[in-house]
């Protein structure tokens, strides 16, 4: 029996599917538009765009795995490279990112590729924080393996979630333009047959350079080609977007959380306050009078 064609969709989205009657779980996503949005917001250089794009892609996969409406995942990557700390936050379809320094410039690697590992650093740690709406979040931390992020996320899944995984992440950039961004996650489920794992290992070179592959064919065609004969079945598709979600109300809460003493100090300086969002660079101004009202509110609470 011939395998069905996967319906073609345009734009950023996550496709979840199974192979070999559920023996293998696969997630593939296109994240071109949100990588471009991140580059524009942060004025990022090509290598920083690639780093942030890869991190958003992998974090969006973790986000789509979350079940609850108010659940979210935050991934902090703290390497010894010049970008400093990079943070991505995702829920079921929305993702945002920021970095200490998104304007780092580095020479290309010897193979002509962007030096993402050099920008992030080869030594450091990656921390995954899952807010499941419980009292305490789930926190998993690993040491960075390469800083290129694909192998680092594979290590995270294997060590922290006891789930052997193949992760491919890619962002193809030309100057200020993101040509293609996306990622693939392949996870053999418990009880997966050895023959199936061998098939995946044989095919893995085909999706090693995923962003370049995605410039040459639709993501759906790539899935059909890569997993032909392995009974791919699409489970669901989730639109993805860069979305911050900051608001004046949230900034008010942030000011109140400083505490009465700190708020009073700001009021005494009588210059008001300006808070900026790290993820979208929106600025929020508060007058001294507005700060007094927040102080009263903090005192009541």
Language-model segments: residues:
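Cys/His-clustered metal-coordination modules, chiefly Zn-binding fingers
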Residues: 205-301
């Amino acid at each position: 029996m011939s395998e069905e064609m996967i319906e073609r969709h345009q734009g950023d989205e996550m496709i979840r599917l199974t192979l070999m009657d559920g023996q293998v779980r696969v997630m593939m996503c296109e994240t071109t538009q949100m990588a471009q949005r991140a580059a524009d917001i942060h004025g990022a250089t090509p290598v920083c765009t690639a780093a942030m794009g890869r991190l958003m892609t992998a974090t969006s996969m973790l986000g789509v795995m979350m079940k609850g409406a108010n659940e979210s995942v935050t991934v902090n990557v703290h390497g010894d490279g010049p970008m400093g700390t990079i943070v991505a936050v995702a829920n079921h379809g929305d993702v945002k990112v920021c970095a200490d320094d998104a304007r780092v410039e580095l020479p290309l690697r010897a193979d002509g590729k962007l030096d993402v590992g050099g920008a992030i650093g080869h030594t450091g740690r990656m921390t995954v924080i899952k807010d499941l709406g419980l009292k305490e979040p789930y926190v998993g931390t690993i040491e960075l393996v390469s800083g290129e992020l694909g192998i680092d996320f594979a290590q995270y899944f294997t060590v922290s979630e006891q789930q052997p995984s193949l992760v491919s992440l890619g962002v193809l950039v030309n100057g200020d333009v993101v040509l293609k961004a996306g990622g693939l996650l392949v996870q053999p489920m418990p009880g997966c047959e050895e023959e199936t794992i061998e098939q995946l290992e044989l095919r893995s070179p085909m999706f090693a350079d995923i962003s370049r592959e995605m410039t040459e064919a639709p993501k759906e065609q790539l899935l059909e080609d890569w997993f032909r004969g392995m009974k791919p079945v699409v489970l669901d598709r989730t639109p993805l977007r860069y979305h911050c979600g900051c608001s004046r109300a949230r900034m008010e809460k942030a000011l109140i959380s400083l505490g009465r003493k700190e708020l009073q100090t700001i009021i005494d300086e009588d210059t008001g306050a300006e808070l900026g969002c790290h993820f979208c660079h929106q600025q929020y101004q508060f007058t001294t009078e507005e700060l007094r009202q927040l102080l009263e509110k903090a005192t009541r609470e």
